[in-house]
């Protein structure tokens, strides 16, 4: 059920108690999307173990099925198979491609479809997705010859893509965005000539790792791996993909374990890709009691188990440099800041204003309802920690990461809370509420 669908009763959030035990978080959302997309345009069968069975990857699968790709049902704890149609085998769909609430689906689809010469596609989504900016993808694609049109000069869905023969080029992206980069890399696979994408800072690199594993001629160079070059012509081959646990979902348990008195949690099989581990760097800055256990490599991605125990936390300051490595963790870090004695500062986070919600405004509004002292800035917030939070009537405002962040805050409140639209968590973590109940003690 979409968080924007029929309303559910407010969930009661009980304060107090502790947390103990082991938990496996769902498969990484970024890798889940990409394994479906790359498997679809490969030749042969791709099997995916651990794919996230949540709304966003299901939207990606539905779009691919509408273009003739055979994908097995996506179910919890099941293997998913994708029967690839090759680089140019996607069919023109008979219907609008519904991306649901998933910005990743829409942005990566733009890159995937821009070079399907002679075919026409229309992409749409829910009310939230229709407000999210898409020109950041459409504009650089246009420099390759793409034809993407939509509301607000091609910035807002619904979007129409008229497939074209694309040309390779050198493209500098204005922001360090893995979605923008990945869309351009997908387009580059069928372009006429070499394409180089240059980022202002390195963003998560799952696409580069996976495309090479599937057989693409892709090179990474330049300072900090910010120049990515694709030479078209190679055939992609189906692969066996193992999806590690999503560190963005693990972040809720990491912060909860650090904050809740007596807590001792181990999060198993978490992806530790260095472009995603900003949350661990900040927790270390806060003096959190965290251990990385059983480090290993699984299908080209570093993986480990994370143990976190309760202890006092120091205030922190994060800015633009680290933001690409933890942009999805800012909501839960704003909760952590409320329980540090002193002032914490988050800056360089203006990207959060165009996520599923304006996450800076929503987190400030909801935490203030609990008694937090927060000053909101254009690109972040200042949080004056150490003040007790009280139970309150809360609302996820349809955002999955807000819902789970507020759940953690409610554990530390002086009284019980209620949460409207708690079902939003299913977008990335369908079993979150069950896991929370199981870990409480």
Swiss-Prot record:
Catalytic residues (UniProt): 328 (proton acceptor)
Location relative to the cell: Cytoplasm
Annotated family: Belongs to the EPSP synthase family.
Function noted in UniProt: Catalyzes the transfer of the enolpyruvyl moiety of phosphoenolpyruvate (PEP) to the 5-hydroxyl of shikimate-3-phosphate (S3P) to produce enolpyruvyl shikimate-3-phosphate and inorganic phosphate.
rRNA processing among keywords: no
Principal location: cytoplasm
The protein's annotated pathway: Metabolic intermediate biosynthesis; chorismate biosynthesis; chorismate from D-erythrose 4-phosphate and phosphoenolpyruvate: step 6/7
Any one cellular-component term (Gene Ontology): cytoplasm
GO process terms (BP): amino acid biosynthetic process; aromatic amino acid family biosynthetic process; chorismate biosynthetic process
Assembly description: Monomer.
Reaction it catalyzes: 3-phosphoshikimate + phosphoenolpyruvate = 5-O-(1-carboxyvinyl)-3-phosphoshikimate + phosphate
Region (Disordered): 1-21
Single GO MF annotation: 3-phosphoshikimate 1-carboxyvinyltransferase activity
Protein name stated in the entry: 3-phosphoshikimate 1-carboxyvinyltransferase
Domain of life: Bacteria
KW Methyltransferase (keyword) present: no
Top EC class for this record: transferase
Record EC number: 2.5.1.19
Binding site for phosphoenolpyruvate: 29, 103, 132, 179, 359, 401
SUPFAM superfamilies: EPT/RTPC-like (SSF55205)
Binding site for 3-phosphoshikimate: 29-30, 34, 177, 179, 328, 355
